[in-house]
Amino acid sequence: MSNNTDLSPVHVIGGGLAGSEAAWQIAQAGVPVVLHEMRPVRGTDAHKTEQLAELVCSNSFRSDDAETNAVGVLHAEMRLAGSLIMACADAHQVPAGGALAVDREGFSQAVTARLEAHPLITIEREEITGLPPTEWGTTIIATGPLTAPSLAEAIAAETDADALAFFDAIAPIIHFDSINMDVCWFQSRYDKVGPGGTGKDYINCPMDKEQYEAFVAALIEGDKTDFKEWEGTPYFDGCLPIEVMAERGPETLRHGPMKPMGLTNAHNPTVKPYAVVQLRQENALGTLYNMVGFQTKLKYGSQTGIFKMIPGLENAEFARLGGLHRNTYLNSPVLLDNVLRLKSRQTLRFAGQVTGCEGYVESSAIGLLAGRFTAAEKLSQAAVPPPPTTAFGALLGHITGGHIVTDDEPGKRSFQPMNVNFGLFPPVDVPKPEGKRLRGKEKTIAKKRALSARALADCRNWLSLY
């Protein structure tokens, strides 16, 4: 680390996981940083301490398996990049099987201590109530899902009232290669060809009356998650949870998101489906499909069991399960460029969950990238995005435009927060053992290992550029 104290400081707003990581990366590159955190001057309903990088929910950073799990690959890439968050997590881990879980107090205290001790980091405990003044120059906004209302209003005014969401309505996402296409078929309703469409843009899963009635009953009986007190999230008709719709009457779903009109079963064209579940392409790669209209507050265990009742999804592998909760985040693919700058004001960069990533590790990773991009610019170097084959690049690609934009569901945003998963990675050729054809689980594991190995190799090459 070399000190460039003649440089004006970078300002980072928000001392959560992303802001802490961004500040660390910038300072480690030799650039001074001012980290602004509003706690304890102003608290939130979720935070309990004034520590930086406080974990407000789980203490788990999820799987640490860097061979067959995408978040484990992200862990490994972050360690390669000198992540403060991963270093403190490793130092304060607690037993959790194959997962990386931490002593939450020890972890946050360690992050705070490291940042406070860094000679190039100044921590200001104050609330930032609006967008930064122009004299601040380069600024990273990493204010997270509980962004203070005054700052959220300022961001909305700068971008667009429709560009900032305050709740996410998340439908489950399924890996395409786990869908049984002997049961399902491609078709848009009434074969409609929309912008960029072909008339065969949806995967359709048919149900007869008996299957539909059993499915509706399971939705109603399934275990639900309650809102946390601080979320205060209202239901609104544009994105009602699927189980709430089911409770409104036995026919509600088949006249709503599961209506069969305009669809003909390609495998059995003479039999009209009683109801149809539609899946829509989620990413440009075509590796992920989301369940249209299936935002839900069902507990995860209930979701997997109930949704596998759907014909064609009996062996479904979920890249993400559904949810509906309080979350302030940008319509990032529209607003941000490929190095996380606001297109309309390039001195502003966003990081963390406010960009539309989901999870502790993902938020930290985007903070890491924002920090590295910013430091490079301050040092008159090129800010080079990571390759899309890396976990860093796959996650960044989702945020800055890898999803498919749709306008066919009133009241819903097509861009929704996402955890890192292998469906975001470009496909890879899986090496086959000589004289052996891989099938089933063996093939899936081989594919994940190939994606992981490529990601880590490409990440090392990318890091050598900095």
Curated annotation (Swiss-Prot):
Q: Which SUPFAM superfamilies match?
A: FAD/NAD(P)-binding domain
Looking up InterPro entries in the UniProt record yields:
FAD/NAD-bd_sf, MnmG-rel, MnmG-rel_CS, MnmG_N, TrmFO
Residues bound to FAD = G14, G15, G16, L17, A18, G19
What does this protein need as cofactor? FAD
Keyword terms of this UniProt record: Cytoplasm, FAD, Flavoprotein, Methyltransferase, NAD, NADP, Transferase, tRNA processing
Entry annotated with the keyword NADP: yes
Xref: Pfam families:
GIDA
Q: Where in the cell is it found?
A: Cytoplasm
**Which processes are annotated in GO (biological process)?**
tRNA methylation; tRNA wobble uridine modification
Q: What is its EC number?
A: 2.1.1.74
Of the GO CC terms on this record, one is:
cytosol
Q: Which reaction does it catalyse?
A: uridine(54) in tRNA + (6R)-5,10-methylene-5,6,7,8-tetrahydrofolate + NADH + H(+) = 5-methyluridine(54) in tRNA + (6S)-5,6,7,8-tetrahydrofolate + NAD(+); uridine(54) in tRNA + (6R)-5,10-methylene-5,6,7,8-tetrahydrofolate + NADPH + H(+) = 5-methyluridine(54) in tRNA + (6S)-5,6,7,8-tetrahydrofolate + NADP(+)
* Similarity comment text for this entry: Belongs to the MnmG family. TrmFO subfamily.
Summarize the protein's role: Catalyzes the folate-dependent formation of 5-methyl-uridine at position 54 (M-5-U54) in all tRNAs.
Identify this protein by name.
Methylenetetrahydrofolate--tRNA-(uracil-5-)-methyltransferase TrmFO
The gene it comes from is trmFO
